Amino acid sequence: MSKLVKTLTISEISKAQNNGGKPAWCWYTLAMCGAGYDSGTCDYMYSHCFGIKHHSSGSSSYHC
């Protein structure tokens, strides 16, 4: 059984963390935010996943 275990290198872990979930995770979150389910992360997700930010009249908001 111990032969089934694979030890990940630091670079493999970093790569998985940096790419984890994209794009499916981002599209799922976008759909949930668009449906009105906001757990306080929608602004962050729009910025992180899509890099979309809208500035108007001194305030900023994210949009698709």
Swiss-Prot record:
Gene3D superfamilies: 6.10.140.1280. GO terms for cellular component: extracellular region. Residues 1-21 form the signal peptide. Glycans are attached at residues 39, 64. Transmembrane segments: none annotated. It comes from the Bacteria. Has antibacterial activity against L.plantarum ATCC 8014. In purified form, the activity is bacteriostatic (IC(50)=2 nM) rather than bactericidal. This is Bacteriocin glycocin F.
